[in-house]
A protein has these predicted regions:
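Active-site histidine-anchored catalytic micro-motif
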Residues: 1-218, 222, 227-327
Length: 327
């Protein structure tokens, strides 16, 4: 019996065509993209109206897609999401954290070049994605350039080559070649699921990001903290989560967290880990900052969005980080 796959086409480069104003999303992809695979799988398409350039994706879009996926999951063997690459890792991470107890594969893919462009990576990425359903995953994953990555920890790492995505902490779940199929499979055994328990993001959730750079005085950042309307802040600090040990900055962090707001400290190093290794990091932890461990920006954004949406406190955020193997 053929597997039934629900295809959610959100937009992105994969289906774009050239217009007088530049590349624009086009629905023509529907008629040809998955036709070569129809002998083995049954596809039902849902084309978002309008199709969205992924740089314009909003929390409302992501919530709408989640609600549609949740409604369709009982009737399908898996979900394929065609998404623009600019924010695909953000969406994948949010899907992964929102869909607790997922027991079917949700595969996201896109391309660096339009489907009809010369030497496009789109046909190969589609072939990889379709083949990934044979692995019977029970999680959200990104299929790109011959590799299947777990959503959590994944990032877009290149705009210049076909190898657009990577997961520097967790690596690939599996690798694919046309003449070998899947190999180097490292999918972990999944725990028994008691059923899907969705945790949807609120479109009104406000999360901000600040990145430390040399010469950007701690005083400037601390002066800005009291005026942030955001409900959670992600701080991209140095190395192991280090920041200036300026007393005013530490006091500002403490005042921010004492308002019940969340401040998550992550490393700006692509393969970094925020932990209180040095005294500066420990001072921030004592002030109420949450060390995000191996959390990358995309995962941190998803985590803080759900934290704000569901009124999580710092202890709950740390519990989630441990469950994600990020601490």
């Amino acid at each position: 019996m053929k597997q039934k796959i629900f295809v959610l086409y959100t937009g992105g480069t994969i289906g774009m065509t050239q217009s007088s104003a530049g590349l624009r999303p086009d629905t023509a992809l529907v008629d040809k993209a998955l036709a070569p695979f129809s002998d083995g799988l049954d596809f039902e398409w849902h084309v978002c109206q309008p199709l969205i350039d992924s740089s314009a994706v909003t929390l409302q879009n992501q919530r709408d897609w989640l609600e549609l996926i949740i409604a369709k999951l009982p009737d399908y063997d898996g979900i394929l999401v065609l998404h623009g690459t600019d924010t695909m890792a953000y969406t994948a991470n949010l899907f992964a954290l929102s869909l607790q107890g997922l027991d079917k594969p949700i595969i996201l893919t896109g391309s660096q070049w339009p489907y009809d462009a010369a030497n496009s990576d789109a046909p190969r990425n589609l072939a990889i994605s379709v083949s990934a359903f044979s692995l019977k995953l029970k999680q959200v994953a990104i299929a790109f350039d011959g590799k299947l990555f777990p959503a959590v920890g994944s990032s877009k790492v290149s705009t210049e080559t076909a190898a657009g995505f990577d997961n520097l902490h967790f690596g690939a779940l599996a690798e694919w070649e046309e003449n070998k199929g899947w190999h180097n499979i490292r999918t972990a055994p999944t725990q028994h699921s008691d059923g899907l328990k969705p945790r949807l993001p609120s479109p009104e959730a406000k999360v901000s990001v600040r990145t430390l750079i040399p010469g950007y005085a701690a005083q400037e950042l601390s002066d800005g903290l009291p005026h942030l309307s955001t409900q959670a802040l992600i701080l991209q600090s140095y190395g192991h989560g280090n920041a200036p040990s300026d007393d005013a900055f530490v006091r500002a962090v403490q005042a921010f967290t004492q308002q019940g707001k969340l401040l998550l400290n992550i490393s700006q190093v692509p393969q970094g880990c925020a932990a209180a290794v040095y005294a500066q990091g420990d001072a921030l932890r004592q002030a109420g900052i949450i060390n995000g461990g191996k959390c990358n920006l995309e995962t941190a954004t998803a985590l803080m969005t759900l934290a704000v949406s569901h009124d999580w406190n710092a202890d709950k955020v740390q519990q989630e980080l441990r469950q994600l193997n990020l601490l």
